[in-house]
Amino acid sequence: MKRLFVLLTALFALTQMNAQEKKNIRISTDNTDLILQVAPNGRLYQTYLGDKLLNEQDINHFSYAVKGGSDGSVSTRGWEVYPGSGAEDYFEPAVAITHHDGNPSSIFRYVSSEQKAVTGGTETVIHLKDDQYPVEVTLFYIAYPKENVIKTWSEIKHNEKKPVTLWRYASTMLYFSDHSYYLTEFSSDWAKEAQMSSQQLQFGKKVIDTKLGSRAAMHTHPFFELGLEQPAQEAQGRVMLGTIGWTGNFQFTFEVDNVGNLRVIPAINPYASNYELKPNEVFTTPEFIFTLSNNGTGEASRNLHAWARNYQLKDGQGDRLTLLNNWENTYFKFNEELLAELMKEAKHLGVDMFLLDDGWFGNKYPRNDDHAGLGDWDAMKSKLPGGIPALVKSAKEAGVKFGIWIEPEMVNPKSELFETHPDWAITLPNRETYYYRNQLVLDLSNPKVQDFVFGVVDKILTENPEVAFFKWDCNSPITNVYSPYLKNKQGQLYIDHVRGIYKVLERIKEKYPNVPMMLCSGGGARCDYEALKYYTEFWCSDNTDPIERLFIQWGFSQIFPAKAMCAHVTSWNKKTSVKFRTDVASMCKLGFDLGLKELSADELAYCQEAVANWTRLKKVILDGDQYRLVSPYDGNHMSIMYASPDKNKAVLYTYDIHPRFGEKLLPVKLQGLDAKKMYKVKEINLMPNSKSDLAANEKTYSGDYLMKVGMNAFTTNQAFSRVIELTAE
């Protein structure tokens, strides 16, 4: 009996020791579990990422070890959460540090962790420390249960005798073990943003990155879709959507290893960015935001949309302003009288605001084209003798708000600013200067430049507190890559420049929290969730051809809610009707950029009614759940709908792009309705003196019928559109 007691005591002690050695950290939403484990060697590993487990005790069944391949040591390494370089891991590290003594290796061991409630979810903080050097890494995870979104980032700091050099600095590292992986990426160019393409990931690395600095996303966007076991699909299959909150150079690395596991590594692009980190200085990586779904990209997108409106997007719960912009109507050629007339047109159209675009500033070097004036943010006296105050007054008299365009991060060599402060621009010494759009990028790593850029906005709002909106542009990538301010620390330019932008935006947000701003970068070359903490919306593309916009807006909708996406009715592709152009813009945040005088009486009446309908239904469009029903990538038609959270109201958009002769037309099957409710169908946005030919118009159907059988809404007409309102009875 005594021997049995001793044996049981020993077994209990061993069990307790193993439980302590295998500490599990659970990061959970309502649908997803991310399980991390502290192994007996003191290091932190990912043991599970997938559907949420119902039984809390089940997380103890996981082991940090992975299946070995030809290299037996793989079985002991496991999926380390934040692996350093230079030790035993053969694959891409999360962090690479050269210590002050030249040692290039890092191994981090678990110190402690804590969890606390934060707005909308739970924050988990995990502290790691190198056991040979005074270097610490802190991992942050915020899980948003209802939205099924996890946000994660890291901090690196040290207390060595001298600075260390950071060569890699990932936000996180995530692992997947499936038979196959399919990546959807979003390529871009001017007027060709958010173009979707997919491929199967094979052994080795696939890297998506950018090296453009300020206009960073001009060629590729900072988000992706990952299909697990099958290509990502809209309404079925396991998918991950991920995006990094960084307005500069980013890098996504997808590495399939020798045993078929996948590492996903989101990070600042380390290209030309060997960062010198001083003792006790904190290096914070960007936030990586991701969501998982077993029901395709549609559900995953709705997760991100809801999360963004609730927690990330500036004024995500607030209203948005419809507007009339003057750019495509006047370009640089305008005066006070013409602008006053356009403000009256804005009121007549029914929009909330008139937005004055480029060309209003510069005196010694007037901004009459794109060769001069950037940096000199005083109203041009020859065009606008009354300055901004006169424009604000005219807008007020017309009954609309007034907004204005700025590009404060840029400078023309032909400007008083450049004459006074040539050292404020990013320019190479001893080299011929290369100009993009005849301009240079101001060096936002320089605190004096940060003060100047903040002062541009501050001066306008201090002198004109009734200015209601800013369109903030950024047309040039960083060229001539050299910072006069950083001198011998050029490896920090790409990073400190972006951080400088954030410092400016934080000051603006703190002093003017209620002023909405549109993010623009020669179109949609800036579109990330860190910038959108400071902007209410972004300009998707300079391409406003409605057919091209269907593809562009479809792509951006994978990640961003309609509330954040600006779409304007313009004169691009006049072969299409004003109705078609307006219906395409109406699926996002609506605006206009054309002169009313070029519209016929019927076209103007149509636009006025469309604005009124959009305003009446904007809560559904901007704050409802989005369902992408028919993809333009799959054929000659597209359909998208929005449903209110209570399922009492929905708005359906259908677009015929280039139907084939005799093409078979299938019903559009709706989603997001209440199967038991009855819905009255009504086609809206009709041209004057025309009637709907929609067979379902003015009829009532059950939500069940509309979702299972659908509605015959497509036609064989070229560039034809419908907007259909559904109301529960």
Walk through the language-model features, giving the residues of each.
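Active-site neighborhood of glycoside hydrolase catalytic domains
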Residues: 385-387, 419-421, 425-579, 589-594, ...
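Carbohydrate-binding surface patches
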Residues: 31, 224-226, 234, 631-675
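Bacterial Sec-dependent N-terminal signal peptides
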Residues: 1-22
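Glycine-rich, aromatic-flanked loop segments that form ligand/cofactor-binding clefts
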Residues: 86-108, 231, 236-249, 291-313, ...
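Polysaccharide-binding surfaces and accessory modules of carbohydrate-active proteins
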Residues: 21-35, 44-255, 271, 678-690
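C-terminal beta-sandwich/jelly-roll accessory domains of carbohydrate-active enzymes
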Residues: 658-729
